[in-house]
Structures are given as C-alpha cells and as structure tokens.
C-alpha cells in the first residue's frame, strides 16, 4: 500500500462531485463521481493531454486522483459498500480498455494506508450482469500475457456487440 499526504497535492473540487488535480499549476486529471445509496459511482476519470505527456515519471495522475478522492470521502465519514464504474464502448474503440481494465484490476495495491477499505475487483459484461452479480472470471493479473489476451478479446467482443462493460469493487472496511 502507498501512503499519500494529500496536503502535498494541489487538488480542487470544481463542484461537489468533480475533483481536479493540478501539477505545477497545470490541470492534469479530473474525476467525476456520485454517491448513490451505498454505492460510489465513478462517472468519469481522465488525464488531460498535458497530464498524459507531462515529463514526470514519478507521477501517476489517475491513481493519485482516485486515491485522493477515497481519502477525502473517508475523512468526511462517507460510507459505501461498492465502487462502480462504466467502461464505455467508445473507449474500447480507442483501445483504452487495454490500459484501463488492468489499472482498475490492480488499483487495490495503490489504496492509501489511511483509508480503511479493502477493494475486491470484479468485471461485468454489462449492467444487467452487474446487477445480478455475475462477474466475468479473470485470469490472475500476475499472468500478464494471459490477462492481456483476455482483455483484448473482451474489448473486441464489446466493440462487435457495441455495448459497455462495468467494473465494481466490493468495499470491505478493514478499520473504522
């Protein structure tokens, strides 16, 4: 697990549900979300063009902004049982799922120590499968070639069917 001192980050809430991250006063990433009952919905997470090309290999803006949000919500005392996001078929067309699915699958290792959550990742064919808790069996992430081949096929199937996929983390509290 990583430790974040969020006071070291230049982040701002654009509104109640949009967090923006800056590096040297340059806008680098944005995360939009909503709290819906017992679920935290990630409605948008992206790096700006500058954030994608910034010459700082020690910074992982997508990871950092997601972690900052979790710390912020934890400090506010927000409680949720799951974190849900949609993987748009448009992003699959741009081949983005090849990086976003592995990123979400391994995000647990970047969850800050101070956040009392353990996140268990699951991937779903579509929203109906998610609502029925019918996740897609995933190869182990450490089997990189098998995982990459799985993601490539999963992405192509969704492009052919022109449908979105969903991911979800079951949130387990590990300390109050």
Question: Which residues are covered by each model-predicted region?
Answer:
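Generic marker of "main functional regions" within proteins
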Residues: 50-52, 71, 114
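Terminal substrate-recognition subdomain of acyl/acetyltransferases
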Residues: 10-36, 74-75, 79-176
